[in-house]
Amino acid sequence: DIPSLDLTNMVMQNADIILATGGPGMVKAAYSSGKPAVGVGPGNTPAIIDDSADIRLAVNSIIHSKTFDNGMICASEQSVTVLESIYKKVKEEFLYRGCYFLKPDELEKVRKTILINGALNAKIVGQKAAAIAEMAGVAVPPDTKEQLQVLHRR
């Protein structure tokens, strides 16, 4: 089929969940579809790991993408959604590969460091995860590859 708005709407009506990337029109259409939707704009790339995934490969790919150039490329993952049935294995793999899961109080410190008055703090751009944590007053191992936070679990 040739891509079209009609075809896109048909796919959205028959999907269980919609992951909409691209311009504001596409994201708005996904949110208006009546289906659960994750809408992202430029530079907010999500990843979804389901139970058919090769967990080791998925986690390694996400880390490789996110740590290349310290996440400067807008195509690097900004969020990861994981099925509950494989959550523990995925978390263990992230930990095994040098990632750090922020505790709630640490998350608040990091948030206040990366966002100042609702705008991105330019001082964190292109910095390694451990450097951002240090700026926030959070102690992480110096070889930490990425800082992660569990935002919602069901």
What is the predicted function of each stretch?
Residues 1:
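A glycine-rich phosphate/pyrophosphate-binding beta-strand-loop-alpha-helix module
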Residues 6-7:
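Short acidic active-site motifs
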Residues 10-11:
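Structural alpha-helical scaffold elements that stabilize or flank donor/cofactor-binding regions
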Residues 15:
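An anion/phosphate-binding loop that grips the pyrophosphate of nucleotide cofactors and donors
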Residues 18-30:
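Glycine-rich phosphate-binding loop
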Residues 27-154:
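ALDH superfamily catalytic-core signature
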